[in-house]
From Swiss-Prot:
Molecular function GO labels: GTP binding; GTPase activity; magnesium ion binding
Stretch list, region Disordered: 120-145, 326-348
Superkingdom assignment: Bacteria
Record domain Obg: where: 1-160
Organismal lineage: Bacteria, Pseudomonadati, Pseudomonadota, Alphaproteobacteria, Sphingomonadales
Recorded family membership: Belongs to the TRAFAC class OBG-HflX-like GTPase superfamily. OBG GTPase family.
Binding site residues for Mg(2+): S174, T194
Enzyme Commission code(s) on record: 3.6.5.-
Subcellular location as annotated: Cytoplasm
The name this protein goes by in its record: GTPase Obg
Domain OBG-type G: 161-328
Length: 348
């Protein structure tokens, strides 16, 4: 499935149905008078957050959404039926933004089942019965129905994850997320192997949490360099960041600083999020070098440094313990029991 995290669509609520021009015609009633009913209301545009969707790719192929109009009124003072609401299903975490320079936030759907009645359908037109007065007892005018509302909007998907992975390209983020989940992210010995965000669910000590891997950041990413800046929005909602630094980099302190500078430049308080710093790919190093690099990285970051290897699995469980602690003990998994709560992590 292709991943798309933003789309521009046109939406229009339904027009109101026209009122009816009708006169009462019954036996023995010579002057029946007007009895045209009002038109029905047009359908609303409704956005609904749906679990199980994780991309906006469908909106690349269908960009215009129009609700149906209300039905016309009828004789015998019958009001037309209202047009059905048009429900547009989007992934949980979708924001609806105005098509202006500021991209004004109009709605934010963060829970499955959440609905927003976004555009109201037009009211139905008046039937001729409503125009009857003491001086105009047989009116023939009627209302055509009010038009619905219409606008262009942007949809932007911000994935909902408890923890976010950050780091330079080729820092081993995809290998890590594959090791602790069943995300099956693409892995390669070259930069920008990951070109779109990946989500995985970690099952650890009877609890589950979601972790997101975004494409690697390079210097100048906040200004558009590389591909990572576009996807930084996906970690805005994360409670904690796991910052992986490749132990094989020429200067681990510089590698750490480049990513932190880009987080600060991006804004959205990413720089203020709790962070766990980890030295990755330690399976190729001896203990003495690991200790030296960890000390160098700790001096630069001001945080304790954990050492791990996504490839061999060394040091992963303590990192998951720290993530679970930082997240704040999410809800137990559906199959958790008292014995499992003390068990090891496992991908699900």
């Amino acid at each position: 499935m292709h991943f798309l995290d933003q789309a521009k669509i046109f939406i229009k609520s339904g027009d109101g149905g026209p009122g009816a021009v009708s006169f009462r015609r019954e036996k023995y009633i010579e002057y029946g008078g007007p009895d045209g009913g009002n038109g029905g209301k047009g359908g609303d545009i409704v956005f609904e957050a749906v679990a199980g969707l994780n991309t906006l790719i469908d909106f690349r192929y269908t960009q215009h959404f129009k609700a149906k109009r209300g039905t016309p009124g009828a004789g015998r003072d019958r009001t037309g039926a209202g047009g059905p609401d048009l429900v547009i299903q989007v992934p949980v975490g979708t924001q609806i933004l105005a098509d202006d320079e500021e991209r004004t936030l109009l709605a934010d759907l963060t829970k499955a089942g959440e609905r927003v009645h976004f555009l109201r359908g037009g009211d139905g037109g008046r039937g001729n019965a409503s125009y009857k007065t003491s001086t105009n007892r047989a009116p023939r005018q009627h209302g055509p129905g009010w038009p619905g509302e219409e606008m262009w909007v942007w949809l932007r998907l911000k994935l909902l994850a408890d923890a976010g992975l950050v780091g330079l390209p080729n820092a081993g983020k995809s290998t890590f997320i594959n090791a602790v989940t069943n995300a099956q992210a693409k892995v390669g010995a070259y930069a920008f192997t990951t070109l779109r965000p990946q989500l995985g669910v970690v099952s650890h000590k009877g609890h589950e949490f979601v972790i997101a891997d975004i494409p690697g950041l390079i210097e100048g990413a906040a200004e558009g360099a590389g591909v990572g800046d576009r996807f930084l929005g996906h970690i805005e909602r994360c409670r904690v960041l796991l910052h992986l630094v490749d132990a094989n980099d020429a200067d681990v302190a510089t590698s750490y600083r480049v990513v932190r500078d880009e987080l600060e430049a991006y804004g959205a308080d990413l720089i203020d999020k709790p962070v766990i710093v980890a030295l990755n790919k330690i399976d190729t190093l001896d203990d003495e070098l690991i200790a030296a690099l960890s000390a160098e990285l700790e001096a630069e970051s001001g945080h304790p440094v954990m050492a791990l290897s996504g490839a061999s699995g060394a040091g992963i469980e303590p990192v998951l313990d720290k993530l679970l602690e930082a997240i704040g003990q999410p809800e137990p998994g559906p199959d958790a029991d008292e014995e499992e709560k003390g068990g090891d992590w496992s991908p699900i």
